[in-house]
UniProtKB/Swiss-Prot annotation:
HAMAP family: MQO
Protein name, entry field: Probable malate:quinone oxidoreductase
Catalyzed reaction equations: (S)-malate + a quinone = a quinol + oxaloacetate
Pfam families to which the protein is assigned, alphabetical: Mqo (PF06039)
Pathway(s) where this gene product acts: Carbohydrate metabolism; tricarboxylic acid cycle; oxaloacetate from (S)-malate (quinone route): step 1/1
Keywords: FAD, Flavoprotein, Oxidoreductase, Tricarboxylic acid cycle
Organism: Proteus mirabilis (strain HI4320)
Gene3D superfamilies in the record: FAD/NAD(P)-binding domain
Cofactor(s) demanded: FAD
Taxonomy, superkingdom: Bacteria
Amino acid sequence: MNKTISEHVDVALIGAGIMSATLGTLLKELESNLKVAMFERLNDCGQESSNSWNNAGTGHAANCELNYTPPNPDGTVNISKALEVNTEFDLSRQLWSYLVTKGKIADPRDFIHACPHMSFVWGADNVKFLHQRYRQMSANHCYENMQYSEDKQQIEDWAPLIMEGRDPNQQLAVTRVATGTDVDYGALTHLLVKQLSQQDNFELHYKHDVIDIKRNETGGWNIEVKDLTTHDKYLITAKYVFVGAGGRAIDLLQKSGIPEGKGYGGFPVSGIWLRCDEDKISSRHHAKVYGKADVGSPPMSVPHLDTRIIAGKRSLLFGPYAGFSSKFLKHGSYLDLFESIRPSNIEPMLDVAKDNWSLTEYLIGQVLQTSAHQFEMLKQFYPQAQHEDWQEAVAGQRVQIIKPAAKHHGVLEFGTELISSADKSFSVLLGASPGASTAAFIAINIIKSCFKQQLENEGWEDRLKTIIPTYGIDLKIDADACRNIRASTAKILKLETP
């Protein structure tokens, strides 16, 4: 960590999570002379949603998450969103592979492991849905290796815990993508920030809180930073600012004063996992098994039983159980939600509250659940689960986007959204899932939008193609490019399956 703070930087990164670390890495690879400073109010990087245990660690390729493939009225399934997320994850794999090849990440097994992704449903209607989904997805080259089975012995071979003790007459179906991954985004964030901190023209400042940000007369930004150790305050100017501060992003967007952020708000959702560290159990489950959310439930309610590999230790995670907290960050304040209310966003927020009563009911139900009720949900996936083998763990806070719509109206968004100033000198990332898995895709979009001059006229595009070989290629269409890059990155990242 740097002891001195430069008064002027080219790029200021606010927040030291996976998003800022990814954007900073790409920018420094494209132009090593860029002067970049990263500010984080906590004492380490990756401590909020990027933290290893604050997210599910799914290499989010839309292999198994059924909320990305909604049914159509005619009985078919819409797979367009799944294909987008699937190929966006390929960009992250390419960036990581480049860093491994360059020696900037020594061993990819420090953050990523092969882990099959499975969808698991029961009941005639759900089985019919999953089979239709499989038929459509496996016909596309992006999912050509997807497997489907209703055979109970086959399912038990793939995931024994979900079958042992189950009613033999229950109608079941699964899909399986053997090439899925488990990603430790906390470890990855540390690896990215470490290699950044070893470069010239990069400053890292922990325990430094950005308390205000305003446009200056030169078109750049004045950033007021407080050293939380000494309580000294500093003024830094930056040509470009990226806010990747998770739940803090709403506050900094509002302080920036950019008109593009007017009317935006946030709706915080807390999460709880059940976690099992017993080797005798975790060693018998090697998959991320996603179920189907109840009709009318929000996307955050999709239950899943996951293998997690963190610091070489295999564990299991089940959940999430959602709840409500007015905090925007785990290390935040209970006043966060109330302090985010402005005249410009109060009507969209009230409109969302009025139109999303089902979400309110769902969250109330989750908050009122007893531990016994929570455990019954686990037993739907793992019938022989025992209370004593599991402990409760608090997940990261997710702040869903409340977005202004027509006059005085608002909509609740469950994805991520990048908001930039008109002159492209300021960007902020709002939202949650799929988040970390598509960090490279988001960073590339920032570069295309906010560094267009450098990309087109200063050689950045050729350098970007060296880092991301399929840049400019639509992997949803080019089957050969898709197969080739997946084989290449699997080899470099040591993800090859038997």
